[in-house]
Amino acid sequence: MSNTLKITLVKSLIGTPKQQRNVVAGLGLKKLNTTVVRSDTPEIRGMINKISHMLHIA
């Protein structure tokens, strides 16, 4: 289980640039406080780095 990440959206998408909203959608997050489990790959890490201020990673 160490090669997976629990990603939670903790900040609203209102007023964010379209690029950030696209990254959130690419991670599979839809609403505030939703959580998804994704594999720990460089692609996912890159997406997380772009919107790290909006996420909680466990």
UniProtKB/Swiss-Prot annotation:
Q: Which top-level group of life is the source organism from? A: Bacteria
Family matches, as SUPFAM superfamilies: Ribosomal protein L30p/L7e
Question: What does the entry give for GO biological process?
Answer: translation
What are the boundaries of the signal sequence?
none
InterPro entries in alphabetical order: Ribo_uL30_ferredoxin-like_sf, Ribosomal_uL30_bac-type, Ribosomal_uL30_ferredoxin-like
For this UniProt entry, what's an example GO CC term?
cytosolic large ribosomal subunit
Keywords annotated in UniProt: Ribonucleoprotein, Ribosomal protein
State a single Gene Ontology molecular function: structural constituent of ribosome
Give the family, as the similarity comment puts it. Belongs to the universal ribosomal protein uL30 family.
Q: How does it assemble?
A: Part of the 50S ribosomal subunit.
**What is this protein called in UniProt?**
Large ribosomal subunit protein uL30
Organism encoding this protein: Pelobacter propionicus (strain DSM 2379 / NBRC 103807 / OttBd1)
